[in-house]
Amino acid sequence: MRVTDFSFELPESLIAHYPMPERSSCRLLSLDGPTGALTHGTFTDLLDKLNPGDLLVFNNTRVIPARLFGRKASGGKIEVLVERMLDEKRILAHIRASKAPKPGAELLLGDDESINATMTARHGALFEVEFNDDRSVLDILNSIGHIPLPPYIDRPDEDADRELYQTVYSEKPGAVAAPTAGLHFDEPLLEKLRAKGVEMAFVTLHVGAGTFQPVRVDTIEDHIMHSEYAEVPQDVVDAVLAAKARGNRVIAVGTTSVRSLESAAQAAKNDLIEPFFDDTQIFIYPGFQYKVVDALVTNFHLPESTLIMLVSAFAGYQHTMNAYKAAVEEKYRFFSYGDAMFITYNPQAINERVGE
């Protein structure tokens, strides 16, 4: 399969740079997986699409202010993007500089360069950085860090992004990017879903900066997926198994919830799904056998990205590309702050040939 098979034309004007004034007021394009039929509506229509007893699985990660500016003590400017917090004092990060710092290099971080840190080791493209400060990493990031808006949102971060670029149920700090499908859920909608009898469960996947890395190979099968930490606790496993036993659907809110659930299913030895607390490098593309997820809430993804491949594996390649073509024609808003899709599983997707 070629990466270019997942390309589509997207006018710049359709990339959303700000969210809607109300979280749940965005548009919703529904794609019926088996037939490919499309329905246009608004996000609150989700209430009519879910049945009592269906299970919504959310990702409760919280975005950290992971972008830091500063300079090397020797003079050159640097930009640091935290990939993950290793412990109370150390981070693993991407560093942009005219010349990469060497182990032992002193870094002065923050807009006022008030935080002292040391680059202690290099691991491939990532740098290990230790803060020389009494405060925890999270406290330091909260005081000097910027919200790491995706590269296609072409503006500086604003104070409002600290809340707007978080889901209302975010709980566990650690992500470099928001699980954006969840941004559309506000408290009134969640309350209505609960009142209808829709069940809810929460996984954790700390989205890494790798989510924005382009696929740099021509053939999909050659791509090496970035690694992210995921948690699927026992209560989620119980909720999934109970929903399946009732004949209800498991609906993943966002591709990160999909990747968490399907990672836990892949690693399970005795049951459909078992608890999972580990790094995952799961790469879902056409031909993948879904085991857990029956429906998906997701935003519109970048051309040639691993996420449009994941959706194609779920709904079918042809149905997905047709839906994206319709979304462009109907001027849906794309990417992190954009509109959403509701997709049901296409069991024939696994047999579909792509790019032939």
Swiss-Prot record:
It is an enzyme of class 2 (transferase). It catalyses: 7-aminomethyl-7-carbaguanosine(34) in tRNA + S-adenosyl-L-methionine = epoxyqueuosine(34) in tRNA + adenine + L-methionine + 2 H(+). SUPFAM superfamilies: QueA-like. It comes from the Bacteria. Keywords: Cytoplasm, Queuosine biosynthesis, S-adenosyl-L-methionine, Transferase. It is found in: Cytoplasm. Its main location: cytoplasm. Its EC number is 2.4.99.17. One of its GO terms (biological process) is queuosine biosynthetic process. GO terms for cellular component: cytoplasm. GO terms for molecular function: S-adenosylmethionine:tRNA ribosyltransferase-isomerase activity. Pathway: tRNA modification; tRNA-queuosine biosynthesis. Transfers and isomerizes the ribose moiety from AdoMet to the 7-aminomethyl group of 7-deazaguanine (preQ1-tRNA) to give epoxyqueuosine (oQ-tRNA). HAMAP family: QueA. Belongs to the QueA family. Monomer. This is S-adenosylmethionine:tRNA ribosyltransferase-isomerase. It comes from Escherichia coli O45:K1 (strain S88 / ExPEC).
